A protein has these predicted regions:
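Left-handed beta-helix
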Residues: 30, 35-36, 41-42, 47-48, ...
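Residues at secondary-structure transition points
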Residues: 23, 61-62, 83-84
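Polar low-complexity intrinsically disordered regions enriched in Ser/Thr and small residues
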Residues: 19-22, 63, 106
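Terminal amphipathic alpha-helical/low-complexity segments used for targeting or macromolecular assembly
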Residues: 1-31, 37, 43
């Protein structure tokens, strides 16, 4: 999968789309791509070659959100957590448009279809 190439430094994050929350902030590992109007706040880890597309919201204000290597969050999706319910997305995952993921675990190489809702403590297996 080819993603738009980031500009130096290795990650392209336009000003104003990320924010710290109670000393929690984005940790970007390797090269990745984040759309200019995506909202990312709090304790978020984005692994190498991952992407977050237009109008997506990642809120790590309560627990950590991890976006695995080569995974993508498509347009309009919302990712959030609750106390004791972090959100983990494995490698090679595609999260379709307008998906709601809340405090769940998505294993490697999985497709989450357009408009899906997956809530606290749910676990979706590989493939």
């Amino acid at each position: 999968m080819d993603f738009p190439q980031p500009t130096p430094p290795q990650t392209y994050i336009p000003l104003g789309v990320t924010g710290d929350f109670e000393n929690k902030s984005l940790k970007s590992e390797g090269k990745n791509w984040i759309a200019s109007n995506a909202i990312i706040i709090g304790d978020i880890v984005i692994k190498n070659d991952a992407s977050v597309w237009f109008n997506a919201v990642l809120r790590g204000d309560i627990e950590r959100i991890i976006l695995g290597e080569g995974s993508n969050i498509q347009d309009g999706s919302v990712l959030h957590t609750d106390p004791g319910c972090p959100l983990t997305i494995g490698k090679g995952v595609t999260v379709g448009h307008m998906v709601m993921l809340h405090g769940c675990t998505i294993d490697d190489d999985t497709l989450i279809g357009i408009g899906s809702t997956i809530l606290n403590k749910a676990k979706i297996g590989k493939n």
